[in-house]
Amino acid sequence: MIRIDHVTFSYGEENESASGVQDINLNIEDGQFIVLCGESGCGKTTITRLINGLIPHYYEGKMNGEVWVNGAKVSEQPIYDTAKTVGSVFQNPRSQFFNVDTTSEITFGCENLGQPEQSIRERLEKTVRDFRLEKLMGRNIFHLSGGEKQKIACAG
């Protein structure tokens, strides 16, 4: 579950072009699917940064209110704990990849968490089946279409 309670955030001086958000309230229940849409600059990216912990752990600014993910305050959790349950896929995900090939990118998260090799192989096989990625395995990420890159980002 994700809950945003009366959150106002304004970016610091290093990011003056972003305006932030004012008095946002949002509840997303387990299993619920939402879409954030709106004009450029309306706060969509800021809301995702609040949920995934990049705000307040990476982006500086002034924040009031609280963001909760699975009953824990995002501001009090290490960002790596929040990243275990929350992820974001950018419109153009090229800047969020850590590897050049698709297979390594998909397994990166499991490797980073120190999961056993056998478990990683099993999860890779299941993910490839579930996302129907067979034709994308072992390919250079930078030779994929935008939609294919987004699929790899979701799978990872």
Residue ranges and their predicted role:
Residues 154-155:
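Hydrophobic anchor residue at the start of the ABC signature
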Residues 60-72:
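Conserved ABC transporter NBD signature motif
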Residues 37-39:
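The feature captures the beta-strand-to-loop junction immediately N-terminal to the Walker
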Residues 34, 45-58:
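Short, conserved post-Walker A segment of ABC-type ATPase nucleotide-binding domains
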Residues 140-144, 148:
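Conserved ABC ATPase signature
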Residues 71, 118-136:
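Conserved ABC ATPase "signature" region
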Residues 1-4, 9-23, 29-30, 55-60, ...:
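A short, flexible loop at the N-terminus of ABC-type nucleotide-binding domains that lies
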Residues 52, 94, 100-111, 121, ...:
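Short helical segment in ABC ATPase nucleotide-binding domains corresponding to the A-loop/adjacent helical element
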